[in-house]
A protein has these predicted regions:
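Structured interface patches
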Residues: 1-196
Length: 196
């Protein structure tokens, strides 16, 4: 037998709200491109979610992806999973979004870079890659001015202290003299470690 004498009972229940959240993309500028010269489309444009009022009041959008603009030349398309925290419920039933990005007003050109240097080591090394074909992106009035003299390839060997033999090492490409230009893609340089 259970008995009690209560004047008041306190029950705490979370208040849930529904909200349409636009889906967006975070852009990392690079190779002459910024969010100002990109057209971004996300499909669907938004989803409806439910969640605790205190959580949803702080959310105005959902970032579905972060895209490095130096990773592609003129267009990008990917299907991504819509990220939702455990405290939110997707009422739309759509779990993936398609992201399309177009770069406008910029042109690309191939430049053969021969200025290849290393940094981050005092070991004896030999750069086996003597030239590297680099794709450069910039506004039309700038692209024609860029030559091999402006393109510099730097290989950071800081993490290769105990390495021996020939190794393909990621390289960074710089376009000197043009702040609105840069290299597209990833590059590697073959480096031979000759001694200690």
């Amino acid at each position: 037998e259970i008995s009690g004498n209560y004047d008041t009972v306190s029950v705490s229940m979370p208040v849930l709200m529904n909200k349409d959240l636009p889906l967006t993309v975070s852009l990392v500028g690079g190779a002459g491109a910024t969010e100002d010269n990109c057209v971004v489309e996300v499909e669907p444009k938004s989803i409806q979610v439910a969640g605790d009022t205190t959580v949803l009041q702080k959310l105005n959008q959902l970032v579905v992806a972060t895209v490095d603009l130096s990773s592609f030349a003129t267009s990008y398309e990917a299907t991504v999973t819509i990220p939702l925290g455990n405290d939110l419920k997707n009422l739309s039933g759509v779990t993936e979004a398609t992201v399309r990005i177009s770069v406008r007003g910029l042109e690309t050109a191939k430049v053969t870079a021969t200025n290849i240097t290393t940094t981050g080591t005092n070991r004896r090394v030999e750069i086996m890659t003597t030239s590297l074909d680099v794709t450069v992106r910039a506004p039309a009035d700038t692209i024609s001015q860029i030559t091999a003299d402006n393109v510099r390839v730097v290989v950071d060997l800081t993490n290769y202290r105990a390495t021996s033999g020939t190794v393909a090492v990621p390289a960074k490409v710089y376009v000197d003299g043009f702040s609105n230009a840069g290299a597209i893609g990833e590059y590697v340089v073959n480096v031979h470690f000759t001694g200690g």
